[in-house]
Amino acid sequence: MKMFGECHAHIFLNGRNYKEAVALHKNHVSEEAIRQAFAEYRKRGITFVRDGGDALHVSEYASKIAPQYGIDYRSPMFAIHRKGHYGRIVGCAWEGLEEYRDLVKKVKDLGGDFIKIMTTGILDFATKGHVTSEPLSREEVFAMTAAAHDAGLSVMAHVN
C-alpha cells in the first residue's frame, strides 16, 4: 500500500490568503476548517502530515482529531524563534537559553512530537532573494538542538 504524506504543512493556513486564515482562527480554532482540511487530505490519499506549528493553537487541536480521519499527524504545536526575529506567525519567542528550555518543556507538556526552531528569516524577493533577519549562530543551533534532545525530542529546522 502506498502512503502519501505532507511533510511541511501549517494546518492553520488555507493555501490562499494568510490574513484570512489568521483571522479565521484568531479568537478560537475553527474546527470546521480543520475538519475540511483533514477530509481533503483523506480524499487525496494523504495519511501522514507533519505540521510546522502555529501561534494560534490550531495544530494543538488538529493533533487531537487527526486520528478520526486516519491521519498520522505530527506537530511541534508551535515553532520557537529568537525574539525580534522571523517566526511570530508560527510560534513563541525566546531570549535566552533558559527561556528556550522552558518552551521545549511546554512543547513536551502539550504533547508535541518534535521541536521546530527558526534558524533564519524568509527569502525577501523584493531585495533579490536576501534572507530577512540575522540567522542563529552555529553555537545557538547546537545548544538548542542539544536541549531538545535532552528532553527526548528531535528537531525540525526552518532554514533559508
What are these regions (language model features)?
Residues E31-E60, G70-A79, G112-F125, S154:
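Divalent metal-dependent hydrolysis catalytic cores, especially in the metallo-beta-lactamase
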